């Protein structure tokens, strides 16, 4: 009920150091268009820079605006200004928990003056913050009900914006805060105090801000537990970036999420006939994303320039009026507030929603299609984001017959699954009985093979067509199979062998067996034997099961489908991961295993379409080289010897014989032509 983020106290350092400039210059040349500080300085234009105090005040007030917009009346924020003493800006009273009260008080405080007393320190504000944490809120007073002895949880968070010299100064600041916290608890507990509550836990966040471009000697430190009462974290931030840091911290402090609505069409101020797309960042509860998201959807995230947190990007849809049909799949609604409330796109979006319009937001799926996941609408002067259901709900119609991995709904084995659940029920025993089975026996009884659909199995697909098959399957899974059961199973196996020898096709009747009808009978029985052997291997409890397995393997060898050694070694492993109708493995069956494996790999690559351009060119070159006759020196020379290039070159006798042979052949051909003529 009382969480740590119920109480938040800002301690603002109002010492002389915070009157210096932040060194981020803003141009005043509005007529020349927007310019950065560097461009304005280079052009010699008018420019100014905010002080460290102004940056701290603006960012802290923006922090409390977000809290009060999203959690009105339930989360409280207080401000304490520290210089020579602690100045209380507001209290836990609801009358001071508003923006106008805080801003008017900050105007009266003003920028710190340069000549200051040496007593100015942020420690005064930290002491006052601990005392403020001990003060009960109205909700805590109602929970106590006037009973001082009742323990009420009291936790809080202190955010201190200051500037330290080095790590030693920061360490002394932590020690002083922890000492004062322990002293305050001792005053609240003994004797029992009627003015406050003991502090159960405090989270101290120290923001060490420096001007832009100045290096700090204080190092960042993540959340560290100092004691059971105190956790401390330290962040060193340039003054212009303190607003981004507080926006990042508020996401974790209040479990918020950032959403950027993109592609918002807005008309230009200078040209009313044209429009441009703008983006608006909003903050809301983190549950708006976790409720709507599912396993088939991913939330696209991005990081804005200058920030360190992620924001979810959703696309603007065509706006329309808010109807009950849009809210029917709503899973939850959460308040919304813009990050930059003063920007023109944010104000236009807020006014658009407050006028009674609603906007649907799209998110892309993993497959590339889009789905409407959220909706923005306003009711009672407040803007809400609605998380819509993007998955199938119980109110939707029944799925189509082709939905799901099993194909048709009637293909699932619902009846067999119900019988399996009844057989697998476990009942707690009142006392230990040695006659009951042991834990290992119970684990052995667990089903190891259960096809979900009839289309993924041959044995269970033929149960209605073959009369003796259900009884045969029942005998195979029995733990106490005897000799008589083994004989019956042997008879059924031989009946299968006889029908396979005759070439009878298996009696498939449903559409799932239509593909097997067109195949050969040999292929059907080969798949049937494979599944039957797999089922016997997983249920081989007795020697009778092993006899059946040996008989089936011999039957497969007689049928020309004998398993190899590698197949029998991996059969049990494949039985857990494969179905009888799974694609067959390409395994070598001859002694030249390397060649067959290479051919199988090439064939697999060609069929799967995974060949690269290099493989295609290499195979084409190999096919062309196989057509040409190899060099005779390689064919005739023994291994280890060097083949002589042109062995007959320079031999005059052979050259004369070759020339004479050529002349004789020429004269013979001339005579033959004259005879023909």
UniProtKB/Swiss-Prot annotation:
It is found in: Nucleus; Cytoplasm; Cytoplasm, Perinuclear region. Its main location: nucleus. Residues 515-540 form a coiled coil. Residues 578-598 have a biased composition (Low complexity). Phosphorylated. The keyword Nucleus applies. GO terms for biological process: cell division; centrosome localization; dorsal appendage formation; flagellated sperm motility; meiotic cell cycle; oocyte nucleus localization involved in oocyte dorsal/ventral axis specification; posterior mRNA localization involved in anterior/posterior axis specification; regulation of fertilization. Keywords: Cell cycle, Cell division, Coiled coil, Cytoplasm, Developmental protein, Differentiation, Meiosis, Mitosis, Nucleus, Phosphoprotein, Spermatogenesis. One of its GO terms (cellular component) is perinuclear region of cytoplasm. Residues 578-604 are annotated as: Disordered. Transmembrane segments: none annotated. It holds the Pfam family Mat89Bb. A motif (Nuclear localization signal (NLS)) lies at residues 598-604. Component of the integrator complex, a multiprotein complex that terminates RNA polymerase II (Pol II) transcription in the promoter-proximal region of genes. The integrator complex provides a quality checkpoint during transcription elongation by driving premature transcription termination of transcripts that are unfavorably configured for transcriptional elongation: the complex terminates transcription by (1) catalyzing dephosphorylation of the C-terminal domain (CTD) of Pol II subunit Polr2A/Rbp1 and Spt5, and (2) degrading the exiting nascent RNA transcript via endonuclease activity. Belongs to the multiprotein complex Integrator, at least composed of IntS1, IntS2, IntS3, IntS4, omd/IntS5, IntS6, defl/IntS7, IntS8, IntS9, IntS10, IntS11, IntS12, asun/IntS13, IntS14 and IntS15. The core complex associates with protein phosphatase 2A subunits mts/PP2A and Pp2A-29B, to form the Integrator-PP2A (INTAC) complex. PANTHER family: INTEGRATOR COMPLEX SUBUNIT 13, SARCOMA ANTIGEN NY-SAR-95-RELATED. Belongs to the Integrator subunit 13 family. This is Protein asunder. The gene is asun.
């Amino acid at each position: 009920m009382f969480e740590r983020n119920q109480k938040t106290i800002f301690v603002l350092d109002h010492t002389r150091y915070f009157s210096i400039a932040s060194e981020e210059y803003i141009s005043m040349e509005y007529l020349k268009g927007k310019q950065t500080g560097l461009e304005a300085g280079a052009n010699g234009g008018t420019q100014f820079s905010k002080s460290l105090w102004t940056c701290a005040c603006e960012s802290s007030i923006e922090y409390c605006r977000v809290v009060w917009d999203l959690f009105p009346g339930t989360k409280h924020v207080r401000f304490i200004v520290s210089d020579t003493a602690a100045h209380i800006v507001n209290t836990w009273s609801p009358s001071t928990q508003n923006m106008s009260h805080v801003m008017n008080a900050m105007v009266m405080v003003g920028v710190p003056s340069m000549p200051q007393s040496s007593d100015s320190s942020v420690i005064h504000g930290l002491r006052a913050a601990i005392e403020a944490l001990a003060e009960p809120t109205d909700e805590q007073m109602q929970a106590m009900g006037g009973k001082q002895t009742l323990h009420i949880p009291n936790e809080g968070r202190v955010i201190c914006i200051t500037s330290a010299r080095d790590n030693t100064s920061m360490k002394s600041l932590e020690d002083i805060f922890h000492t004062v916290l322990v002293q305050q608890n001792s005053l609240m507990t003994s004797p029992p105090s009627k003015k406050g509550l003991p502090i159960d836990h405090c989270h101290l966040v120290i923001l060490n801000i420096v001007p832009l471009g100045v290096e700090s000697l204080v190092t960042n430190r993540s959340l560290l537990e100092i004691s059971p009462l105190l956790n401390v974290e330290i962040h060193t931030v340039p003054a212009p970036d303190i607003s981004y840091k507080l926006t990042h911290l508020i996401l974790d402090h209040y479990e918020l999420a950032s959403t950027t609505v993109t592609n918002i069409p807005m008309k230009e101020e200078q040209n009313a006939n044209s429009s441009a797309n703008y983006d608006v960042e909003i903050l809301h509860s983190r549950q708006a994303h976790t409720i709507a998201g599912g396993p088939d959807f991913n939330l696209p995230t991005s990081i804005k320039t200058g920030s360190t947190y992620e924001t979810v990007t959703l696309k603007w849809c065509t706006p329309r009026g808010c109807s009950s049909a849009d809210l029917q799949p709503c899973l939850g609604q959460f308040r919304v507030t813009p990050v930059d409330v003063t920007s023109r796109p944010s104000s236009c979006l807020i006014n658009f929603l407050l006028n009674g319009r609603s906007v649907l937001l799209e998110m892309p799926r993993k497959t590339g299609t889009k789905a409407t996941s959220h909706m923005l609408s306003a009711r009672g002067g407040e803007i809400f984001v609605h998380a819509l259901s993007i998955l199938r709900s119980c109110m939707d119609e029944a799925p189509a017959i082709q939905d799901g991995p099993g194909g048709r709904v009637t293909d699932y084995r619902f009846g067999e699954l119900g019988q399996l659940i009844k057989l697998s029920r476990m009942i707690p025993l009142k006392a230990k009985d040695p006659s009951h089975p042991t834990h290992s026996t119970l684990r052995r009884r667990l089903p190891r093979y259960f096809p979900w659909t009839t289309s993924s199995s041959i044995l269970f697909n033929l149960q209605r067509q073959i009369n003796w098959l259900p009884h045969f399957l029942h005998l195979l899974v029995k733990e106490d199979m005897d000799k008589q059961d083994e004989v019956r199973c042997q008879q059924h196996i031989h009946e299968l062998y006889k029908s396979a020898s005759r070439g009878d096709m298996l009696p498939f009747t449903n559409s799932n067996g239509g593909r097997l009808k067109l195949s050969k009978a040999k292929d059907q029985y080969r798949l049937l034997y494979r599944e039957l052997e797999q089922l016997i291997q997983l249920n081989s409890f007795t020697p009778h099961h092993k006899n059946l397995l040996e008989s089936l393997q011999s039957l497969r060898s007689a049928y020309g489908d004998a398993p190899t050694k590698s197949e029998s070694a991996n059969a049990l492993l494949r039985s857990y991961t494969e179905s009888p109708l799974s694609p067959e493995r390409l395994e070598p069956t001859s002694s030249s295993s390397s060649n067959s494996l290479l051919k199988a790999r090439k064939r697999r690559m060609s069929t799967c379409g995974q060949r690269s351009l290099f493989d295609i060119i290499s195979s084409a070159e190999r096919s062309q080289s196989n057509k040409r006759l190899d060099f005779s020196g390689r064919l005739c020379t023994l291994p280890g010897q060097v083949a002589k290039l042109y062995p007959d070159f320079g031999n005059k006798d052979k050259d004369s014989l070759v020339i004479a042979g050529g002349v004789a052949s020429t004269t013979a051909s001339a005579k033959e032509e004259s005879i023909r003529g």
